[in-house]
Structure formats: structure tokens, C-alpha cells
A protein has these predicted regions:
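Conserved glycine-rich cofactor-binding loop
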Residues: 15-16
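Residue(s) in the substrate-gating loop at a strand-loop-helix junction
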Residues: 142
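SDR active-site lid
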Residues: 164, 170-208
Length: 208
């Protein structure tokens, strides 16, 4: 392992999809990694591939950000690990369901992960980055945050929150050498989609 001049990137939702791609690309650019997700087996697999291919130091944290104890553990890492220079807030929960037939507990979990956990991680990372002289925060939003559609009202609202929060903090943090950006992906076929049944219910004949 070679010491990273760029520091360490902590990535949530890193076991598959966009999070795993971020892990791969950041490792190629010289970052060491802390990968966070719910599945330890999947995390271990991603970590091994990256470590073997690029020789970066890769640490994993099994955490469900919808669980307060797990979330607090990740916050503590952000506050206390001086090597961390980037936070990628990628973990999220989605669903495709009319409001009238939705389960309110599922909606609450979506808000907890997409809004509350993301916000708490930003506020764990930002003061630490300022004290260390700089850093980068990437918040995963969605095109649905600016273009709401039916069946995705709560999800789109959570992503609109992410966009608003990011814009609000951009000026404040840029003056302290901390960059923050919101990423607004459109339709991306990932395991996240399979879990929310988006593919079969919204685009049954358009994706292969």
C-alpha cells in the first residue's frame, strides 16, 4: 500500500451501483477508501477488487444509516479520522408507490435515510474539513428533485431537500476551502432500481 496524498474518501451506499463506481474511480485517482453499506459480504467483495487492482487501502463499515446507532458510528468516524478529505453521501432509499397505497413506515425510512442521515453526515464532516483546511462533500440527489413525477412524490421531495441544502451550504463552505456539490442522476439501472421495482413498473420494455 502506498500512502495517499489525496487522503481518504468515505462513501455511503458503496456496495453496488453508483456508490461502487465512485469507489472505483476515486481509488484510480489516488484516494484511500472507507466504504459504508448494509451488506458486509458485498462491501468485502468491492473492497477486495479495488485493493487488488489499485493497491489502495480500503476499509469497510457495515452500517444501516436508517438505524441511529449505526449512523452515529459513521458520524464519529467522520469527526475523528484526520485522513478523510471527501464524503460521498450516496446511500438512499427509493420506492414507486402512490401515496394513498404507500406504507407510512416505508416513507418515514426513506426520509430518515435520504434526508436525516445525509444531513447528519454533512454536519459531521463539514466542521472537521474546515479544521483540517479543506475537503469535499458530494451529495447524491436526483433529477426528480427538480422534475417531480407521479408515484415518486416523497422520494422526489427528499431529493429536492438535498439540492436545497447543498446550494445553501455552497457559499458558506467554499469560503472555508470546502467544496460541496449535488449530483442529479437520471435513470440508472442499478440494484437500487431492482429493490424499488422501478424497472418493471415504469420502464418494462425500455431497459434491457
Amino acid at each position: 500500500m502506498t500512502e495517499s496524498a489525496k487522503g481518504t474518501a468515505l462513501i455511503t451506499g458503496a456496495s453496488s451501483g453508483i456508490g461502487a463506481i465512485y469507489a472505483d474511480r476515486l481509488a484510480r485517482r489516488g484516494y484511500d477508501l472507507i466504504l459504508v453499506a448494509r451488506s458486509q459480504d458485498a462491501l468485502t467483495s468491492v473492497a477486495k477488487v479495488i485493493s487488488d487492482a489499485m493497491g489502495r487501502e480500503v476499509t469497510t463499515i457495515r452500517a444501516d444509516l436508517g438505524q441511529k446507532g449505526d449512523l452515529l458510528n459513521v458520524e464519529e468516524v467522520l469527526r475523528t479520522d484526520p485522513s478523510i478529505t471527501m464524503l460521498v453521501n450516496n446511500a438512499g432509499v427509493g420506492a414507486v408507490e402512490p401515496l394513498l397505497t404507500s406504507n407510512v413506515e416505508d416513507m418515514e425510512r426513506m426520509i430518515t435515510v435520504n434526508v436525516t442521515a445525509l444531513t447528519r453526515l454533512v454536519y459531521a464532516a463539514a466542521p472537521s474539513f474546515v479544521s483540517r483546511g479543506g475537503g469535499t462533500i458530494v451529495n447524491m440527489a436526483s433529477a426528480l428533485g427538480i422534475a417531480p413525477e407521479i408515484l415518486n412524490g416523497v422520494y422526489g421531495a427528499t431529493k429536492a431537500y438535498v439540492i436545497a441544502l447543498t446550494f445553501s451550504l455552497q457559499k458558506e463552505l467554499s469560503e472555508k476551502n470546502v467544496r460541496i456539490q449535488a449530483v442529479l442522476p437520471g435513470a440508472v439501472e442499478t440494484p437500487f432500481w431492482a429493490a424499488s421495482e422501478v424497472r418493471s413498473r415504469v420502464f418494462p420494455n425500455r431497459l434491457s
